[in-house]
Amino acid sequence: MSGSDTAPFLSQADDTDDGPAPGTPGLPGSMGNPKSEDPAVPDQEGLQRITGLSSGHSALIVAVLCYINLLNYMDRFTVAGVLPDIEQFFDIGDGSSGLIQTVFISSYMVLAPVFGYLGDRYNRKYLMCGGIAFWSLVTLGSSFIPRERFWLLLLTRGLVGVGEASYSTIAPTLIADLFVADQRSRMLSVFYFAIPVGSGLGYIAGSKVKDVAGDWHWALRVTPGLGVLAVVLLFLVVQEPPRGAVERHSDSPPLNPTSWWADLRALARNPSFILSSLGFTAVAFVTGSLALWAPAFLLRSRVVLGETPPCLPGDSCSSSDSLIFGLITCLTGVLGVGLGVEISRRLRRTNPRADPLVCAAGLLGSAPFLFLALACARGSIVATYIFIFIGETLLSMNWAIVADILLYVVIPTRRSTAEAFQIVLSHLLGDAGSPYLIGSISDRLRRDWPPSFLSEFRALQFSLMLCAFVGALGGAAFLGTAIFIESDRRQAQLHVQGLLPETGPTDDRIVVPQRGRSTRVPVSSVLI
C-alpha cells in the first residue's frame, strides 16, 4: 500500500467538533488537572527512549544552556555596571547613554524572527554555536573603541544582538523537547534563574573588574573568553532532540512545519500568546529601565544625601551602588523565579488559570513598591533598597511562568517563531525604547531646572516613576490571559495529538457521521 492508503479512514473533527472535554485522559497535562499524573505523559524511561538521551545527559544539556543564558545577561548588564564611566569617557548625557541599550535591543529584536524561523526548521545546536562565536568576537572588539568614536560603540553593541537572538529564541525550545509537565516547569525555572543571576553578575563583574584594572574597558573583555568556552560546550555536550516527540502519542502522526505565514496567522489567533506577550512586554519595559538606570539613580541619591562624592570629570565614579544593586538583582531573581514557579505549581492543582494569575499578581504587586522606592530615595537610601528588593522579587515571578505558558499554548513546530515574536513585541514596546525614553524624559526635565546635583536626581526620579504605571498595565494583560488560557492550551494539545489537523484554505469539507453525530472533515480524509 502507498502512504496515502494507510491514512486513517476518517480524521478527527476541527471547528465543528468540541473534542475531548478538559481533563480527558490521554491529553498530557489536560486542563482540569494541569500537569497531572496522566498516563499519556511519558515517564523517565519513556523520555529516554523518545529523545535518545539519558536523564543525566538531558540535565547536562540544560546546565550548558543555563551557563550560556547567564553569560548573555552578564554581558548585557556589564555596560550598566560601568555606565557613569562610559558617560564620562565619551562625554555624553542621559539620552545618549540610553541609546547604548536601545541599539542593542533593537538589533536583537530585528534578528529574533530570523533565528526563530531558522530554529523551527534547521539544526538548533549549530545556529547557537555560530551566533555565540560572533557575539564573543564583537564584544571583544567593542572594548577598544576610542573616545571620539561613540557611534562605533553603538554599532558594536547592536551587532551583539546577533548572538543573543540566535540563542534566546532557540534554547527554551530545546528544553521543551527534553522534558514534559512538572519536569519542564522545574527545568525552565532553573534556566531562568540565570537571567537575574547573570544580570547581577554583570553589575558586579563590571564594577569590580573596572576597580581592579583601573579602566572600564576591561569590564567588556571578561565575557568574550567565557563565550568561547560556551561554544565548545555547545558543540561537545548538546544534542538535537526530535521536535515535539515527547508530547505525542506513539500512534500520533508526526508534526511537520507549516509555512511561515501560516505560523504567523496561527499565533495571531492565539489570545493567550498575544496577551501574555503584552504582559511580558511590561516586565521588559520595567526591567530594562531599572537595569540601566537604577545604579545611576542610586548614586545620585547618595550624592544628594551627602553619603558619597559626585562623579566629576577626571575622577573614577563610585561603583558601590552597582555592586549592591547587582547583589539585589541576583537574590531577588532567584527568590522571585523560585517563588513564582512553586506558587503556580501548587495553585494549578485547583485552578487551571494559576499561571497567568500569578504573573498578574507579581506585576500588580511590584508597582507600588517600585513607586515607594523612588519616592523614599531622598529620605532614606536603606528604605529605597528594601522597596527595590520587594519590587524586583515580585517582578521576577514572571520569567519562568511566561516561558511555560508559551510552550503549552503553542505547538512544537511554531515555538521558535513564537519565542522570536514574543521577543520582538516585548522589546519593541518594552526595553528597546524604555532606557532611551527614561533618559530623554530626564534630560527634558533637567532643562527646566537650574543645574545642580539635586536637579539631576529629581529628573531621573520622576522619569523612572513611569515604570510603576507600565507595571500595572502589564498586570491587566495577564488578567486577560487568564480568560483564554484553558481553551488555548487544550487546542494545542489536540493539535499535537493529531486530533486537530491543519487543513489548507482550499480543502473542501463534507459532513460524515462520527461517534453518533455529524462531524465536518476534509474530503481528502475519506478518499481511499
Curated annotation (Swiss-Prot):
PROSITE patterns: MFS (PS50850). One of its GO terms (molecular function) is transmembrane transporter activity. The keyword Transmembrane applies. One of its GO terms (biological process) is regulation of lysosomal lumen pH. One of its GO terms (cellular component) is membrane. The chain crosses the membrane at residues 50-70, 98-118, 126-146, 160-180, 187-207, 218-238, 278-298, 323-343, 357-377, 381-401, 421-441, 465-485. Plays a critical role in the phospholipid salvage pathway from lysosomes to the cytosol. Mediates the rate-limiting, proton-dependent, lysosomal efflux of lysophospholipids, which can then be reacylated by acyltransferases in the endoplasmic reticulum to form phospholipids. Selective for zwitterionic headgroups such as lysophosphatidylcholine (LPC) and lysophosphatidylethanolamine (LPE), can also transport lysophosphatidylglycerol (LPG), but not other anionic lysophospholipids, sphingosine, nor sphingomyelin. Belongs to the major facilitator superfamily. Spinster (TC 2.A.1.49) family. This is Protein spinster homolog 1. The gene is SPNS1.
